[in-house]
Each structure stands twice: as structure tokens, then as C-alpha cells.
A protein has these predicted regions:
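N-terminal maturation segment of proteins
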Residues: 2-171
């Protein structure tokens, strides 16, 4: 998540952009890219011979899904802190002490926790769109470059950036 191809790679690419674009921060892009980086590690075989590592990766996916439910529960459904902690305990197998500070963060930063999985899902959706539209012209590396070279952008701009990649590669 924090390393390559996650935030480190995203940061390296952002250093190539004009200053104003390198300082913009859109949580769904940044955290979504980092989760997508975790997925890339899995797809590229990082866990093929490390079963416990893959289990940790899968557990982290479940944790991120719980985050979305808990953040929404707290801010849209009127959940208490105790309900949020209990959701993690019951649904993810977390220990209360492990998630209490997480829940406190969600209480003080509405919507931040949902950005991880929302951004990841949008990047995955855009990749599927590129693969489907481009067929054999789709290039895995070029797609990923198009995403990160576009900079840390809102999700609607990401879609436009991928659209330009598709148009340039489909010709």
C-alpha cells in the first residue's frame, strides 16, 4: 500500500507533473491507487508462494469493505461508536482494541475511509473499460501509466484520462 506500486509509485509520478498538479490531493485517487497497487502485487504473483501473505491481503480487502459500512453507518445511519466497533468485531474478526482508533478517525473525518475502496473500484472499473474497448490493443503497463501520469485527480477526471488513453491506443 505505502510502497511500490502504491503511494511511492504515485508520488514518483506526481513529481513529474507541474507543481500545482503535484500538490492536489483527492483521497479516492490516492488511496484508491494504493489499494489498486496491492491488487497489482497479487496479480503479478507476489503471494503465489506466500500463502499467509495472500491471506493478509484478502483480510485487508475485507477490512476496507468494513470501513465503508462503518463510515456510512456513523455518518448516515446514526451509529454509535460502540456499534461501529462491534461491526468490525462481528464481521471482520477484529479485536476491539485494534479498531477503536480507526473508528475514532472515521468519527472525526467523515467520508475519508470510504475513499479507499471507492477509488480502488473506480480504477478497476476503468481498467475493465479499457480492456473491453481496446481488446488486443490494451496494454497493462500503458494503462497504469495513463492512470498515474494523469496525476491525483477526481474520479470524473480519471475517467476522462482513461478515455484519452483508450482513444490513443485504439487508433
Amino acid at each position: 500500500h505505502e510502497a511500490i506500486p502504491g503511494h511511492v509509485w504515485e508520488g514518483e509520478y506526481s513529481n513529474r507533473l507541474p507543481l500545482i498538479r503535484s500538490v492536489l490531493a483527492f483521497n479516492p485517487f490516492s488511496e484508491g491507487w494504493a489499494l489498486y497497487g496491492e491488487q497489482l502485487a497479487d496479480e503479478l504473483g507476489a503471494y503465489d508462494e506466500f500463502v499467509v501473505g495472500r491471506l493478509g491481503y484478502l483480510q485487508s480487502l475485507a477490512f476496507r469493505a468494513c470501513r465503508m459500512v462503518v463510515d456510512t453507518g456513523l455518518h448516515a445511519k446514526g451509529w454509535s461508536r460502540a456499534q461501529a466497533v462491534n461491526f468490525f468485531v462481528e464481521r471482520n474478526g477484529s479485536k476491539p482494541a485494534e479498531v477503536e482508533s480507526e473508528v475514532d478517525r472515521y468519527c472525526s473525518w467523515p467520508g475519508q475511509a470510504t475513499g479507499y475502496k471507492l477509488g480502488h473500484s473506480r480504477i478497476v472499473d476503468q481498467r475493465a473499460r479499457a480492456e473491453t474497448t481496446m481488446g488486443t490493443a490494451y496494454d497493462f503497463k500503458a494503462f497504469n501509466d495513463a492512470v498515474v501520469l494523469g496525476g491525483n485527480v477526481p474520479m470524473d477526471v480519471l475517467e476522462k484520462n482513461v478515455g484519452r488513453y483508450i482513444a490513443s491506443g485504439s487508433i
